[in-house]
């Protein structure tokens, strides 16, 4: 069974103001000193499956910026723009529909783009157990 990783990255950048804004939302900030939160999330979840199975859900206004930020870590045609920003469940449903149309059945793991995971190995072990 294929594993599809979905990263939700459509936040407007208002909750972390004044550091983040609409043009530089939190997921595009480098808070760890290593990389942006979105790129750290991509690096983490791509250990579970191939980058072909990685999808990012964002909003229309941030799609181009997201493509620049993630560069070659995610296929640009897998960066999905929500037609209308609604909420978390709508973003998950939007990703699920796109994945089902493209690939059919599989396991979809959903992650926020802006979380800091200190114990990465433990996190990945937990995900692998859940997938089994």
PLM ranges: what are they?
Residues 1-7, 15-18, 22, 33-112, ...:
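Conserved N-terminal catalytic core of the sugar/cofactor nucleotidyltransferase
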Residues 131-132:
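Conserved donor NDP-sugar-binding/catalytic core segment of glycosyltransferases
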